[in-house]
């Protein structure tokens, strides 16, 4: 994974988080999963994002996981850390302690439980972070949070932050599933910031626009397909009539349709438990819950069919 490039480039994986029987992070299995993905050619890892059940882990748990990965030999420059908490102190603590261990890339997004939060309040929140971290060698990415609803990051807040702290933000990460929203951000801000998406089904659209960087949850299970999708903007085959056939696009659509009606994290963890032949991967932290047995059975059959169609 290690490269000399600065910031997010190529395919970064929003890592699923393996848990032990006590629902604590299983650090050894996390390391092994990262090593497996690295062999497949991913560019880096995102820790404690939506697929990593980030909101379920405390600041100290996140710091401990980073430390253990570094001790096992994972490079700090191959990590991007979700550092959003409802409290400024926790966000600052995580960023400062991880940065002291060599990590430079951090993702922050609205984490407000207060329904009275305002644009001015969001600007003040992120401005305080920017002021406290000013002068440090950091890469800060602002991210949307669809769960924030009306209090999500919006163009007004972004514009004010750029006016006040332009040099401190590296890019914008759209965590919505709305391609139009991502394109709106590109039109408004691409001359000032890099614009990325975490929506796997939008990766092809971004690649066709020349953006060959993205954060993927599906890459936990299908890394090779996601790498090809992000790095290519051409159909891989042609029909007998010369018409372009997007084979990888068809495979990605099939994978998406397989799990689209299910909660994403439990579904992906179940698929990974099948792939690794390790039932321990099939654990989530409440308030998430596992898929029921009938859903498991259907998903297993669909995944076997998918793997057969994806085989070279």
For the regions a protein language model found, what residue spans apply to each?
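Active-site beta->alpha loop and helix N-cap motifs at the rims of alpha/beta catalytic domains
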Residues: 2-152, 169, 288
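C-terminal alpha-helical cap/extension of soluble enzyme domains
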Residues: 7, 12-16, 40, 211, ...
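Soluble or luminal CAZymes and related metallo-dependent hydrolases
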Residues: 29, 61, 121, 177, ...
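A general structural signal for well-ordered alpha-helical segments in protein cores
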Residues: 62, 66, 91, 126, ...
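A structural signal for short hydrophobic/aromatic patches embedded in well-ordered alpha helices
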Residues: 65, 161, 299-300
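Short glycine-enriched loops at secondary-structure junctions
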Residues: 85, 200-202, 274
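Broad structural signal for hydrophobic residues in well-ordered alpha-helices, predominantly aliphatic
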Residues: 129, 161, 185, 271-272
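Catalytic alpha/beta core domains of metabolic enzymes, predominantly
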Residues: 134, 145-262
């Amino acid at each position: 994974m290690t490269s000399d490039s600065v910031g997010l480039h190529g395919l970064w994986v929003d890592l699923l988080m393996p848990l032990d029987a006590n629902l604590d992070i299983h650090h050894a299995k996390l390391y092994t999963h990262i090593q497996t993905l690295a062999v497949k050619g991913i560019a880096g890892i995102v820790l404690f994002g939506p697929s990593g059940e980030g909101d379920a882990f405390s600041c100290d748990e996140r710091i401990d996981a980073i430390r253990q990965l570094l001790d096992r030999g994972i490079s700090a420059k191959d990590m991007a850390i979700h550092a959003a908490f409802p409290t400024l102190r926790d966000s600052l603590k995580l960023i400062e302690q991880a940065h002291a261990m060599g990590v430079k890339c951090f993702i922050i997004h609205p984490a407000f439980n207060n329904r009275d939060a305002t644009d001015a309040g969001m600007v003040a929140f992120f401005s305080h972070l920017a002021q406290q971290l000013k002068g440090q060698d950091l890469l800060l990415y602002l991210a949307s949070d669809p769960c924030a609803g009306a209090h999500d990051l919006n163009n007004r807040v972004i514009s004010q932050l750029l006016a006040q702290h332009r040099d401190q933000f590296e890019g914008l990460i759209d965590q919505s599933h709305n391609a139009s929203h991502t394109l709106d951000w590109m039109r408004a801000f691409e001359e000032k910031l890099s614009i990325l998406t975490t929506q796997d089904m939008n990766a092809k659209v971004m690649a066709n626009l020349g953006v060959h960087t993205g954060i993927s949850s599906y890459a936990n299970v299908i890394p090779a397909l996601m790498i090809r999708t992000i790095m290519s903007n051409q159909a891989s085959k042609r029909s007998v009539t010369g018409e372009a056939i997007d084979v990888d696009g068809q495979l990605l659509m099939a994978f998406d349709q397989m799990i689209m009606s299910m909660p994403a994290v439990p579904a992906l963890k179940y698929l990974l438990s099948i792939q690794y032949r390790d039932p321990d991967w099939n654990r989530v932290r409440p308030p998430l819950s596992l898929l029921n047995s009938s859903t498991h059975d259907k998903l297993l059959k669909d995944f076997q069919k998918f793997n057969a169609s994806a085989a070279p």
